[in-house]
Amino acid sequence: MNGVVIPQTPIAVDFWSLRRAGTARLFFLSHMHCDHTVGLSSTWARPLYCSPITAHLLHRRLQVSKQWIRALEIGESHVLLLDEIGQETMTVTLIDANHCPGSVMFLFEGYFGTILYTGDFRYTPSMLKEPALTLGKQIHTLYLDNTNCNPALVLPSRQEATQQIIQLIRQFPQHNIKIGLYSLGKESLLEQLALEFQTWVVLSPQRLELVQLLGLADVFTVEEEAGRIHAVDHMEICHSAMLQWNQTHPTIAIFPTSRKIRSPHPSIYSIPYSDHSSYSELRAFVAALRPCQVVPIVREQPCGEFFQDSLSPRLSMPLIPHSVQQYMSSSSRKTNVFWQLERRLKRPRTQGVVFESPEEKADQVKVDRDSKKHKKESLSPWAGCLSRLCPHPLQARKQLFPDFCRKEGDEPVLFCDSNKMATVLTAPLELSVQLQPVDEFPFPETREEIGLGSPLWSGGGSGSPTRGKQSNGMGCGSPPTHISRTTHLTPESGGLALKYLLTPVDFLQAGFSSRNFDQQVEKHQRVQCNNPAVMNTVDDV
């Protein structure tokens, strides 16, 4: 990006990154080439100053809103405010840069002294006759286009390069001519070629609109077969395109540029026609202005050493007025706010099709398989029934049923010492299990302490339910029989795990939570204490 924020000022030229602009408040565009509009788009929402032609192209090509574009006439001086109270002002004058349609140089004058920003320009002696430069003004800082600032690079003038192109075309009187161009620039060259060879120049509709805006001669058309000279995008000229063109009609291609180009086809020619100043022209320009310092616009190519003998004594840095400092600081804060707002409002980008990696998918399948296997081994054979009937936490079920296994007939058995086991039945009353002795639980609690009127039934010798008594001889294979209420538990049947196991059916609801379990138990206890008859009754089956 060829742009700059001028230090100690609120001025930015060809610089469109608000996050990096810092204290910049006034933004200027020298011309519409893409390397000077990086970051500039239709979302731009700040005043922007440029020439009238650039203003038209800016709106047409980048869709920048007209409400932010400030077109300034070339050759006139314009006064702009540098603060919010109108105390400090500066004068900016636009000078034709002789580079492409709408390109200008900016001459800034204010508390910071006099600054000339050339942008991309092709020097001609007539520039020194501009009124803004003939008043004996001292240029304190010169921002110079140093694209061709190389003593080893010798370039002809535009007029000389144009004659070279004309001589080349005359060598191929029966050929079509393809001129490789960028989207903007060298329109005057096309006009000269059309007048020289008395032929139409075929353009794209977009470039035709531009030449009509510039008021050039009526020698341009969009009809492919109307003329032998065709202006095409420079990217279209390649080996395959040359083969295709020559199959229909003999064709040569010309690149009017000072850049070194490796020709991929023998019919492609390069002519050093440049829109940038040559080294000798830069030397003449700097020697005539005698600025205090030269700052290269193309930062990758330092050129200060070439102009040391043409500089005036450097002046001290100017002081920034207090009102301008406030103006610049407020601009910085607003810039950050605008950027944060834009970042929040920006919609997320739509993701494309994302394919899963086969390796990652295989690893995930293996992990899922191992997880299911571990879960199957960890749960008892009755885990499926318990998960459906008893909404107890998985950890509690693991603690309550640690030793279950299956026989060949899939009947549940428990390998244990029958002398140390208590036989109880849980609610819902569909399963018969054996628990460890209550004295082995870490926090023993009696029935009276927890207030459980838990349903309990025991099977007699015949397997039929018995009311009000607990069976002492019930085996593991006794079938469970469902009843709604049972007699009281003995005090020895308490225990921390029984809180979750020996629970009335009406407590086992969808909204059950272990967090409020104790509160529900206390409430149930108070109800039963107030109505003791309920605790001693059993509904008929």
Curated annotation (Swiss-Prot):
Q: What does this protein do?
A: 5'-3' exonuclease that plays a central role in telomere maintenance and protection during S-phase. Participates in the protection of telomeres against non-homologous end-joining (NHEJ)-mediated repair, thereby ensuring that telomeres do not fuse.
Please tell me where this protein is predominantly located: nucleus
> What Enzyme Commission number(s) does the record list for this chain?
3.1.-.-, 3.5.2.6
* Basic and acidic residues bias locations: 358-371
- Entry's Gene Ontology molecular function annotations: 5'-3' DNA exonuclease activity; 5'-3' exonuclease activity; beta-lactamase activity; damaged DNA binding; protein homodimerization activity; protein-containing complex binding
**Name of this chain's protein:** 5' exonuclease Apollo
SUPFAM superfamilies reported for this sequence: Metallo-hydrolase/oxidoreductase (SSF56281)
What Pfam families has UniProt attached to this entry? DRMBL (PF07522)
Q: Which domain of life is it from?
A: Eukaryota
GO biological process terms, semicolon-separated: double-strand break repair via nonhomologous end joining; interstrand cross-link repair; protection from non-homologous end joining at telomere; telomere capping; telomere maintenance; telomere maintenance via telomere lengthening; telomeric 3' overhang formation; telomeric loop formation
Q: How is it modified after translation?
A: Ubiquitinated, leading to its degradation. Interaction with TERF2 protects it from ubiquitination.
Q: Its family?
A: Belongs to the DNA repair metallo-beta-lactamase (DRMBL) family.
For this UniProt record, the keywords arranged alphabetically read as follows: Chromosome, Cytoplasm, Cytoskeleton, DNA damage, DNA repair, Exonuclease, Hydrolase, Isopeptide bond, Nuclease, Nucleus, Telomere, Ubl conjugation
Q: How does it assemble?
A: Interacts with TERF2; the interaction is direct. Interacts with MUS81, MRE11 and FANCD2. Interacts with HSPA2, HSPA8 and HSPA14. Interacts with SPAG5.
Q: Does the keyword DNA damage apply?
A: yes
> Annotated region Disordered: where?
350-375, 450-489
Q: Which organism is it from?
A: Rattus norvegicus (Rat)
Reactions catalysed, as given in the entry: a beta-lactam + H2O = a substituted beta-amino acid
* Keyword DNA damage found: yes
